[in-house]
């Protein structure tokens, strides 16, 4: 039974990832005054399946001097961790209801750094290694701001459980009292998922393709799916944290539809940002976090922690 639950979680995620690639290409196409994919199937709807067949039927080549075990295991580990992060998300009920689901998601996203580092190092290519080091530095740096932003949010929630956020936001979405943190959270999720304008790991003009430069066929497709699964997961998390999802115990489907709509809108914002802004310079990226976001988030964190003490009130105890 558990395996059925697991597959019923994984298969829709992979389908969503497939169609997100199509939505991205269509969005970028229309923003650049062209059509995007429109040959395979009606309006190009079968393009993701054509891409999948092409990638998974090609021969996966491996550089002669690469580390065979790490080179092979890195993409599989990346996708496994990306899918594991979905387990505690309430939609409206999580697959496994954890007391510390938010910490679990942070821990899993930290572990994802290893797959990037292994893939870059095992490729035995200078471009892949530089791309991997950049990706690791960027991911670790922005996780600091994500964790600090989560503290006041969880303080208002009263626990680290994601399921209780629905109850907390019944009357007021947390985006209103926490709007500066919500804005910084959105930018940090862009950086965390290595998306434009923070996609320095795959600077085509300098690093060819970043840490996955030596990958082809199936393993490359796994990295590609990981990136898009992480994007959808981060946006679903943003919707749960700040855009309280409507929940009626008699109609649990309404919660799921609500969450899907909000996640889709946030994902389209990700694509919109990609189409609109140029890439940051590496030092600007680091300065944004360590000199702007970190002092701001720390100050706001102390402010939000002092409010309950000052007003002698307690967060919701659920």
Swiss-Prot record:
GO terms for molecular function: NADH dehydrogenase (ubiquinone) activity. Keywords: Electron transport, Membrane, Mitochondrion, Mitochondrion inner membrane, NAD, Respiratory chain, Translocase, Transmembrane, Transmembrane helix, Transport, Ubiquinone. One of its GO terms (biological process) is mitochondrial electron transport, NADH to ubiquinone. The keyword Protein biosynthesis does not apply. Its EC number is 7.1.1.2. It is a multi-pass membrane protein. GO terms for cellular component: mitochondrial inner membrane. It is found in: Mitochondrion inner membrane. The chain crosses the membrane at residues 2-22, 69-89, 102-122, 146-166, 171-191, 231-251, 253-273, 294-314. Pfam families: NADHdh. It is an enzyme of class 7 (translocase). It catalyses: a ubiquinone + NADH + 5 H(+)(in) = a ubiquinol + NAD(+) + 4 H(+)(out). Belongs to the complex I subunit 1 family. Core subunit of the mitochondrial membrane respiratory chain NADH dehydrogenase (Complex I) which catalyzes electron transfer from NADH through the respiratory chain, using ubiquinone as an electron acceptor. Essential for the catalytic activity and assembly of complex I. Core subunit of respiratory chain NADH dehydrogenase (Complex I) which is composed of 45 different subunits. This is NADH-ubiquinone oxidoreductase chain 1. The gene is MT-ND1.
